[in-house]
Every structure is written in structure tokens, then in C-alpha cells.
Amino acid sequence: MYKLMNGVEIPSIAFGTWKISDENICRKSVKYALECGYRHIDAARIYNNEIFVGKGISEFLKENPNIKREDLFITTKVWNSDQGYEETLKAFEASLERLNLDYIDLYLIHWPNTKNMATTFETWKALEKLYNDKKLGLLEFVTLRNIILKN
């Protein structure tokens, strides 16, 4: 486990779901990963499998009542075409719905919009709003990924 700056702990190894596009395989893989002890599941809207990931999580939790949602760490990402302030807020809500979760632990900007950094900044503002609106309890942590120094 790694302790993040806000005190949230993140499991050091995640089960990634990139390229698992078949519903049955994705759902079963996520469930099996959790059965094997993974507690961090990594998803993204662009992978087109958040619904299947959510089903795997839901089935696992249903069959393992001693493990609660808060014992898991779920990551997903906002894609380039969903960047911008309002767009990111809508994309987040859509991911929550597809995953069938009450909250997401970590929401990332999958790739910065290097052709229009203003869009990336607006996206970041939306992530800050989601994070700072604690009464909603929708998001535990935000960060960037795939950022190169020149960005």
C-alpha cells in the first residue's frame, strides 16, 4: 500500500482491464482478480468495458459479504474527447453509472490535451470540484497520467 498525500491508501498493484472487451471474460477476470486478492481495479471509459468491470465487482461483493466496497480501490479515467469542465463532470457521472458504484477512488486524466492545454486545465478544475465536494463523496483522489515534462 502507498499512502497518498491526502491520507488515502492505494494498493501498490492494480488489475488492469485494458483490451478486455468481451463481457464474459472481463466480468469473470475482474471477479477472479478480486478473489485472488487484488483490491485495486483499473478501468477507463475508452476501454469500453466499465459496465463489465462493474458487474465483476458487484458479483464479487455479493458473494463475499465480509469484503466491503471501501476495501476496494477503483480507478477510471477521463478520455480526450470527454475533456473540458462540463464534459468531464458528465463523463465522471457516466463512469459512475457504468461501473454501478457510489463513488470512484481515483479519477485520472488519461492523456493531456497537448494541442489545447486550456482544455486540460478545465478538466483539472472539474476533477478538483469532484474531489473538493466532500458532501457528495464521489471521489477520493485525482491525478494526471501520461504527462511529459514538455507538456
Predicted regions and their residues:
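N-terminal binding-site loop/beta-alpha segment at the start of enzyme catalytic domains
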Residues: 1-72, 102, 122-126, 132
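Glycine/proline-rich, positively charged
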Residues: 83-151
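Active-site mouth loops of central-metabolism enzymes
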Residues: 11-24, 76-87, 116-118
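A cross-family glycoside hydrolase active-site/sugar-binding cleft signature
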Residues: 14-18, 42-44, 75-77, 107-110, ...
